[in-house]
Every structure is written in structure tokens, then in C-alpha cells.
């Protein structure tokens, strides 16, 4: 059974991450979107790795912390603009997480590890980064695919599915195949896997 090294710090960190994400002005299911996302991601991490280390649990909870503060629309609507936005977001999330963990009193070793996970350093060689990436892909498939498919050209959706699938471990792929997809999403996933 998981026991944080210092339970008060761990609970304070989760509370602060949730507090920050509860400020998201965007909502889904009547909840701040990034708060909901953080909880979904944490759920998948713990499902894939019930004995996840404290650093992985922290990283899951803050992976997209305050994401709305750097909107996609603030970058050129091009592929290079998208990639720059994603790279800047990763750094922003890692910095924000580090600041919060430092305020709470975590040592720099823990902070660096959480930030390395946020930045997905050493992927795919680092097993914890693999778990986090698997969880990110599963959150996408379970909760975001339908929305993407509804507003994106079919070939781009299939491309996104193929990229996600390539990053996933066999265990995560098995979990993905158990998800309850809508009819259109099932067809798109099948085309992605057959293509």
C-alpha cells in the first residue's frame, strides 16, 4: 500500500495542484476542465501502476497545471506553431509544479524528478515516463477522441490515433481496446490500427 514519505506534504501538494486547476475558466461536466483532466490522469496512472511512486503520482496530478493560461490561439496556427506551443507548455507545467512543490518544502531531488516526468525526459526508456505517457494516451482515447473526431478531418484524427498508439505499451493498448467508444470512434480507431 502506498505511503507518502511525508503525508502532510503530499496532501498539501495535491491540494495546491487541484486549487490551481480549479481556477480553469473552461468547464466540462460542470467542473473546471484541467481539474477534471488531472483527476482522470491520476486515475489512469493508478490503474496502470497501483504502486506508483510519490513522484509519479505528483506528476500525474500537475501534468497540465494551469494549461489554459497559454492558449493555443496565442501561437501561429501552423505545425511549427503547434509544436512550439506544446514545448512551451511542458516547460510551463514543470516550472509551475516545481514552484508549488518548493513552496510546500519538497527537496530538490523530488522536484527535479517530478519535472523530469512532466517533461517526459528519457521517454521511452524510463518506466515511469512510460506509465505517464500511457495514461495520457488513455485519457485522450477515453475522454477526448470523440470531440477531436467531431471537429477534425478524418485523416488528421487517424494520424493522431496512430501517433498515440505508437507511443503506448502493450498493456495500455489492451486497456484502450476495452474502452467504450462511440460508433464513429470505433471505425476511426479500426482504420488507424489497420492503416
Regions found by a protein language model. Give the residues of each.
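Divalent metal-dependent phosphate-bond-processing catalytic cores, especially two-metal-ion Mg2+/Mn2+ enzymes
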Residues: 2-5, 12, 19, 26-35, ...
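His-Asp-centered metal-binding catalytic motifs of divalent-metal-dependent phosphohydrolases/nucleases
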Residues: 54-72, 97, 116-122, 136
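A non-catalytic, amphipathic alpha-helix used as a structural packing/dimerization or gating element
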Residues: 12, 16, 88-92, 96, ...
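Long, low-complexity, intrinsically disordered polar/charged segments
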Residues: 59, 74, 79-87, 185-195
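Residue-level detector of well-ordered alpha-helical segments, enriched
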Residues: 37, 52-61, 93, 110-114
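Acidic, Mg2+-coordinating active-site segments of isoprenoid diphosphate-utilizing enzymes
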Residues: 65-78, 141-147
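Helix-adjacent hinge/juxtasegments
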Residues: 73-116
Amino acid at each position: 500500500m502506498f505511503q507518502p514519505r511525508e503525508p502532510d506534504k503530499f496532501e498539501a501538494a495535491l491540494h495546491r495542484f487541484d486549487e490551481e486547476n480549479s481556477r480553469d475558466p473552461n468547464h466540462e461536466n460542470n467542473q473546471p476542465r484541467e481539474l477534471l483532466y488531472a483527476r482522470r490522469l491520476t486515475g489512469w496512472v493508478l490503474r496502470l501502476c497501483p504502486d506508483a511512486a510519490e513522484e509519479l503520482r505528483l506528476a500525474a496530478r500537475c501534468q497540465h497545471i494551469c494549461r489554459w493560461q497559454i492558449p493555443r490561439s496565442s501561437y501561429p496556427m501552423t505545425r511549427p506553431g503547434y509544436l512550439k506551443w506544446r514545448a512551451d507548455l511542458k516547460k510551463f507545467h514543470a516550472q509551475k509544479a516545481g514552484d508549488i512543490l518548493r513552496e510546500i518544502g519538497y527537496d530538490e531531488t523530488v522536484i527535479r524528478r517530478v519535472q523530469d516526468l512532466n517533461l517526459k525526459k528519457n521517454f521511452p526508456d524510463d518506466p515511469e515516463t512510460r506509465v505517464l505517457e500511457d495514461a495520457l494516451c488513455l485519457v485522450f482515447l477515453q475522454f477526448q477522441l470523440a470531440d477531436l473526431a467531431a471537429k477534425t478531418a478524418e485523416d488528421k484524427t487517424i494520424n493522431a490515433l496512430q501517433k498515440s498508439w505508437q507511443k503506448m505499451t502493450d498493456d495500455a493498448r489492451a486497456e484502450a481496446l476495452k474502452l467504450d467508444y462511440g460508433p464513429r470512434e470505433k471505425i476511426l480507431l479500426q482504420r488507424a490500427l489497420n492503416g
